[in-house]
Amino acid sequence: MCGIVGYVGKRDCTEVLLNGLGKLEYRGYDSAGIAVFQDGKITVAKSKGRLKDLEEKMEREGRPFGHVGIGHTRWATHGEPSDVNAHPHSGGRVTIVHNGIIENYKELKDFLAGKGVTFTSDTDTEVVAKLLDYRYNGSPIQTISETVRDLEGSYSLGIIFADHPEQVYACLLYT
């Protein structure tokens, strides 16, 4: 089962997210990642393997710093464990983490591909990120509400929008 952590506050977001993900390690996972608002944009760091692997990767490539972000530990359901399939996933203006299964992700992916949207991972999560971005109209709540109506399955999402740098959105649907 995946683990999701979100943070908005005055402390170093990366530290808070990593600490939160560390508390979820007992659940088991194959990859980990975080997305942090840094210098006016969303910075994503993710890695196959343990949380320690993510921390070592950030030490080599740069550790994001900010005050708002989301984090994730993944237990693969779609796509093999890899850096590419690790969460968070971005659709451009929208970055998400996800727990659960989107049962109709293939149909949604085909719809988006028909509109010229491209994909880099094998995950249902990237499909949701791209669908949110495709539908984004400047209103996160309206976009999320319209998008989740089309998602079939049981899931929870942590979402950040590039133009709303002080907010983390979450939704949950279990059928």
Annotate each PLM feature.
Residues 1-172:
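Conserved short alpha-helical segments that host acidic/polar catalytic motifs at enzyme active sites
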